Amino acid sequence: EQDADTKRPPASVTKIMTMLLIFDAVESKKISLEDKVPVSEFAASMGGSQVFLETGETQTVDTMLKCISIASANDACVAMAEYISGSEEAFVQEMNKRAKALGMHNTNFVNCNGLDAQGHVTTARDIALMSRELITKYPQIHEYAMTWMENITHETKKGTSEFGLTNTNKLVRQYEYATGLKTGSTGEAKFCVSATGKKDDVELIAVVMAADTSKERFADAVKMMNYGFGKCQVYSDEKPMKTKYAVVKNGVEENIEVERGEKFTYLDVKGKDMKKIKKIEKINKKILAPVRKGDVVGSIVYTLDGNEIGRSDIIAKRGVQKAGFSDYLIKVSAKFLIGEKN
């Protein structure tokens, strides 16, 4: 880590937030990947990296995402911003709101594509935060970001033509563990990249800003990820529990079978012996009906060298209803009959 909180212009790495808001809009069903997005005169006028969209042309949201993630298209960014929020200015307000919610305290966006503008700044740490949000919430971004070449079709008044997209992220072809994510470069920002990679179960993000050359930014990103992969190891446990029961009070049944919830994952960066991890299953003693399937009724506690490193929920395998008056009568009658037989 070096100068992680120094404010700098991010160039097209800005588009990570733009794509995050696009996926947010898709998830909320405000838009769909099949929607046709019109291109305004303003969007078509964007300089820098572009796919030469023309005024009045339409492209699907899916195609616009390809243009942004693969070719870093400034014109596609503005077209999407206008489609989602009505104007780039309104969209940028949403970008800053999303950034604040993610804890990106040293970030201020002025536009949606990263062209040099006064006050348009972020930090390496903040870029890592928005990158993590994008890849964890919308892992499908990797399909876009890892596409090396793709063709799109322009349909305009001039006719139909093909346009080739080539990925600006050379790590896609040069680094075996690469999974994305976004490059950027301008005269003011120099060369930037938010690189993501995965090896075994370890996923890393390496952010480089203000490198002097394109080659340098990629070399630095690879160096950081190789260092991270060498230091990090993952312990995961999703082994099913042996059959166990929890005692339920005031229920139509006195016992309920339990099971583990989600798998447990622990990331170690200190070279600890993961074989020394121990786990203890703790089922709550006071469980009152009603109990719903999936309710948390205990936890699996994981420790390493005597220190707790995390927990995983133990949940009810099925539900148990609260006992009513008739249920108590049946129980009392059953006990009475058993007593008479004895």
Annotate the PLM regions:
Residues 1-139:
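Active-site-adjacent loops and short helices of periplasmic peptidoglycan-processing enzymes
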Residues 104-105, 116-121, 125-342:
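Domain-terminus/edge residues, biased toward the C-terminal soluble/receptor-binding domains
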